[in-house]
Amino acid sequence: MRLAILGGIAVTPERVIEDAGILIDEDGRISFVDTREQLEECEDWEDEIELGEKDVIMPGLINTHTHGPMTLFRGVADDMPLMKWLREEIWPLEERLDAEKCRWGAALAAMEALKSGTTCLADMYFFMDAVAEAYAEVGIRAVISHGMIDLGEEDKREEELKESKRVYRKCQGMEGLIEFSLGPHAPYTCSEELLKEVRRLADEWGVKIQIHVAETEDEVKEVKRKHGKRPVEYLDEIGLLGDDVIAAHCVWLDDKEIEILSKRGVIVSHNPISNMKLASGISPVPEMLERGVNVTIGTDGCASNNNLDMLEEIKVAALLHKVNKMDPSATEMLEILRMATVRAGTVFSSEKIGAIEEGYAADLVVLDGSSPRLNPNHNPISNIVYSASGSDVKHVFVAGELVVKNGKLVKADEQEILENSTECAEQLTSS
């Protein structure tokens, strides 16, 4: 059944179209984008949704780095540096996780993400088959990976690869919203043998790789001590890097590493709020963009953010580099929006996502034009980047299916998700 979305202001993001007309085909892809008048003149359809005159319709936001089930850890460990935070708080809690807890944590993440305008997540965590099932049921698109850490131990390496292969098999045949990827945690927690096997499997299976890179200065020192090179140089030397790699953080880079990231086509996920909260540093985003690196935006997990609101994240990303450079033009609003939409669409392989253009998946977000934050609307892109909040989200479509209607989930029971995720969180943190 073909669906027409009529009215509102469409931000594609390359064009702004007033009184828009968008047609979604039977496969959940966009088949027409223009004005309502043009749509009515040359197309027909079976169903339609009428938007308010001031409503803004935009591509769904793409969160290129997160750990969905960590919603269960929201507010548990704050105001700590990364390694202390991991070793004393997060890793001990993660030892108590199981598939059921990760499933409900992921359901909560999907609920929060969709209701704040995110339609796709790149997620690295544990019990990822359960996470994938939760994401599919709630209705969000996701690239999932089992986070692998071997610390140079052969038995642990085999165990991690076995789990990744199990999740890979489980994900085969899942509905098209879910894609599998490989997830070596970081160059300081993964052996060279594991990283080389990840590259071999990624080539064999045709899947993405997700990895944390150069998040802290201490990580850079540790990798240099072990391997004699900085993290990006080391990963390039062993053959891991390519345009199928999603490198999260990339805070502590030198000029040579930026050139390598550009040359290899690596997808960088900039996580400004998490990096600020953990005082990890400021990623050299303007320098990377200038040299052609594909920089995207992610939230990281809820334990270090502490939410999944990508509209908040893009505003912080826009502002952080202005003040860091003492230059208000250091980052421009359209480029920031691209980083969270069409640039980020490269994380998903089987569909074109991240733009309102013909042939792209109909992953769409409608912002409520009656929100005071969106009025007056002199510039819709400015309002999206600098004014909007996740609470302004009215409707969300994923693959042409309405999954949020008037701010409420359509496919899942919100109360059930809240009750079960809260119970799981209490079990984790009870002594």
UniProtKB/Swiss-Prot annotation:
Coiled coil: none annotated. CDD domains: ATZ_TRZ_like. It comes from the Archaea. InterPro entries: Amidohydro-rel (IPR006680), Deaminase_MtaD/DadD (IPR023512), Metal-dep_hydrolase_composite (IPR011059), Metal_Hydrolase (IPR032466), MTA/SAH_deaminase (IPR050287). Zn(2+) binds at residues 65, 67, 212, 300. Keywords: Hydrolase, Metal-binding, Zinc. GO terms for molecular function: 5'-deoxyadenosine deaminase activity; 5'-methylthioadenosine deaminase activity; adenosine deaminase activity; metal ion binding; S-adenosylhomocysteine deaminase activity. GO terms for biological process: S-adenosylmethionine biosynthetic process. Substrate binds at residues 94, 185, 215, 300. Binds 1 zinc ion per subunit. Its cofactor is Zn(2+). Pathway: Amino-acid biosynthesis; S-adenosyl-L-methionine biosynthesis. It catalyses: 5'-deoxyadenosine + H2O + H(+) = 5'-deoxyinosine + NH4(+); S-adenosyl-L-homocysteine + H2O + H(+) = S-inosyl-L-homocysteine + NH4(+); S-methyl-5'-thioadenosine + H2O + H(+) = S-methyl-5'-thioinosine + NH4(+); adenosine + H2O + H(+) = inosine + NH4(+). Transmembrane segments: none annotated. Its EC number is 3.5.4.41, 3.5.4.31, 3.5.4.4, 3.5.4.28. It is an enzyme of class 3 (hydrolase). SAH is a product of SAM methyltransferases and is known to be a feedback inhibitor of these enzymes. As a result of this inhibition, organisms have evolved efficient enzymes to metabolize SAH via different pathways. The pathway found in methanogens differs from the canonical pathway, it uses the deamination of S-adenosyl-L-homocysteine to form S-inosyl-L-homocysteine for the regeneration of SAM from S-adenosyl-L-homocysteine. 5'-deoxyadenosine is a radical SAM enzyme reaction product which strongly inhibits radical SAM enzymes. Belongs to the metallo-dependent hydrolases superfamily. MTA/SAH deaminase family. Homotetramer. Catalyzes the deamination of three SAM-derived enzymatic products, namely 5'-deoxyadenosine, S-adenosyl-L-homocysteine, and 5'-methylthioadenosine, to produce the inosine analogs. Can also deaminate adenosine. The preferred substrate for this enzyme is 5'-deoxyadenosine, but all these substrates are efficiently deaminated. Likely functions in a S-adenosyl-L-methionine (SAM) recycling pathway from S-adenosyl-L-homocysteine (SAH) produced from SAM-dependent methylation reactions. This is 5'-deoxyadenosine deaminase. The lineage of its organism: Archaea, Methanobacteriati, Methanobacteriota, Methanomada group, Methanopyri. The gene is dadD.
